[in-house]
Design a protein with these regions (language model features):
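Non-cytosolic coordination micro-motifs
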Residues: 20-81, 116-191
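Bacterial N-terminal signal peptides
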Residues: 8-15
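A broad structural signal for short, well-ordered beta-strand segments within beta-sheet-rich domains
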Residues: 74, 98-100, 112-114
């Protein structure tokens, strides 16, 4: 009985204090290991009525890349057989504080799939959060100790995340129907 009480007290302290986020690897180098504390009160949240996006920054989901002008290849992500990201000339996303950030547009098999904005620093992340909450409503917060918010709609999924270690924020919206097509493609390729 004493042992059980000791274990329960230890687990309670561990939950209260948390686990250290840095560990040493076999070379003695410090590596970062994130610890996520679930938000037990979190519920799935949709977009505020009438605000679910059917694209991003004026580009509709599944629009063919060839239909757009001024797109410049930026990078390639190897996920799902390759997602090509582009920047659009003279294009930006306006944060809540008025700062403009570049937008990365992701295309899978030449079809528009996702829009993404990266921020640097807490001030700019908070401005992106302010803009997102104002336009789409407050997102679900799945973790108590992380700045992360999610929205799930009929055909769009949106996320807003901040990494306190790198001071980088990310805001993205992606097409759910395109995600399903991509997952089906990967499943076929594996067969």
């Amino acid at each position: 009985m004493k042992r059980l009480i000791g274990i329960l007290i230890s687990l309670s302290l561990l939950m209260l204090i948390g686990c250290p986020q840095f560990r040493s690897n076999f070379l003695g180098e410090e590596i970062y290991i994130p610890v996520y504390l679930p938000n037990e009160n979190c519920q799935l949240v949709g977009f505020k009525p009438g605000s679910e996006p059917d694209g991003f920054n004026g580009i509709k989901w599944e629009t063919m890349l060839s239909m757009l002008e001024g797109m410049k290849h930026y990078r390639k992500d190897k996920s799902y057989g390759g997602i090509d990201f582009y920047l659009k000339e003279k294009d930006a996303f306006k944060l809540g504080n008025g700062k403009l950030e570049s937008v990365q547009y992701g295309f899978w098999r030449e079809k528009f799939y996702t829009g993404m904005v990266m921020t640097q620093g807490l001030e700019h992340f908070n401005a992106a959060k302010e803009a997102a909450f104002s336009k789409f409503g407050e997102g679900a917060k799945p973790f108590r100790n992380k700045e992360e918010y999610l929205w799930v709609g009929k055909n769009a999924v949106m996320a807003l995340r901040y990494d306190e270690n790198t001071k980088a924020g990310i805001f993205y919206i992606k097409s759910d129907s395109m995600t399903k097509q991509m997952e089906e493609h990967v499943a076929k390729v594996k067969q």
